[in-house]
């Protein structure tokens, strides 16, 4: 008993440091899970959640029988796959380039510059995109396209351009966070590997492909698995605010998160919104478990669990 008490006293500061994080997870992640019950009920506001009649799987049937089910699932999945791949490739490339900078002050400036967009709100990003793509005063229509002898484009009325626009906007905003993690991993690589490679006459490209990338594999796999865990979740602001909620663009910008919001705000259908959220969570859970199982089969040490 004395040993246990001593251990509690010894680790008490660490337990207290954990407490805010645990409370945050409990309040924001676990307590909302009780709302899953709404997906199986026909909510009646006068009766409340518990007294409302059960609907079984009717909300899910309505969701999957609607024409939007396939569109929002396809958009959510394909966009997130593109985001993961593009951000990973660009993040690794920028991290390698920054690590090649010898001047420490310049290296810090570049690191700060690449992280700055990540700290911006999506509202600011939406107005930056609007300043570029506005039909009347946008930089692209008024400056860039005339130089290329191309007629102005009504960007907010042309769905075909928006997959590329959203991928570029997401990469510009989000690549900095992953880039810093890759930089931290690159700093941890033993410099003697590179010295030995140079003595053997290796080129810079060979150093990257034979030393840098293999040493980054554990970090890449960890970030990849964490990203896959949220592959069915989208940045609401990116798909709602950046396209300015343009109805013409819904076929290419409507994802599960925006669909849930519109179903809740415009239709007032909380039960169907909850069903879409449950569907989103279950598919994401299955995908991350499957991905972790595959990694575990290949290399146990690199799996999350």
Tell me the role of every PLM-derived stretch.
Residues 1-2:
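N-terminal Lys/Arg-rich, disordered targeting/topogenic segments
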């Amino acid at each position: 008993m004395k040993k246990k008490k001593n251990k509690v006293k010894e680790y008490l500061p660490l337990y207290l440091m954990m407490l805010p994080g645990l409370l945050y997870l409990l309040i924001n992640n676990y307590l909302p899970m009780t709302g899953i019950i709404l997906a199986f009920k026909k909510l009646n506001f006068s009766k409340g959640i518990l007294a409302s009649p059960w609907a079984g799987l009717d909300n899910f049937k309505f969701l999957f029988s609607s024409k939007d089910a396939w569109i929002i699932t396809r958009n959510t999945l394909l966009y997130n796959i593109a985001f993961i791949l593009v951000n990973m490739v660009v993040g690794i490339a920028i991290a390698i380039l920054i690590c090649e900078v010898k001047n420490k002050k310049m290296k810090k400036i570049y690191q700060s510059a690449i992280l700055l967009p990540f700290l911006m709100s999506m509202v600011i990003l939406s107005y930056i995109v609007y300043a570029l793509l506005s039909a009347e005063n946008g930089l692209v229509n008024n400056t860039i396209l005339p130089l290329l002898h191309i007629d102005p484009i009504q960007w907010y009325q042309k769905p075909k351009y928006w997959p590329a626009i959203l991928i570029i906007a997401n990469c510009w905003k989000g690549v900095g966070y992953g880039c810093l993690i890759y930089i931290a991993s690159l700093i941890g690589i033993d410099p003697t590997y590179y010295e030995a490679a140079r003595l053997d006459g290796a080129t810079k490209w060979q150093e990257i492909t034979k030393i840098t990338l293999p040493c980054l594999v554990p970090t890449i796999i960890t970030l990849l698995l964490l990203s896959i865990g949220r592959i069915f979740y989208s940045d609401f602001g990116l798909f709602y605010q950046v396209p300015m909620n343009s109805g013409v663009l819904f076929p290419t910008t409507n994802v599960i998160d925006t669909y849930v919001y519109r179903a809740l705000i415009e239709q007032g259908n909380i039960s169907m919104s909850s069903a879409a959220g449950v569907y989103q969570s279950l598919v994401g859970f299955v995908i991350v478990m499957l991905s972790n199982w595959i990694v575990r089969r290949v290399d146990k040490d690199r799996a999350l669990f």
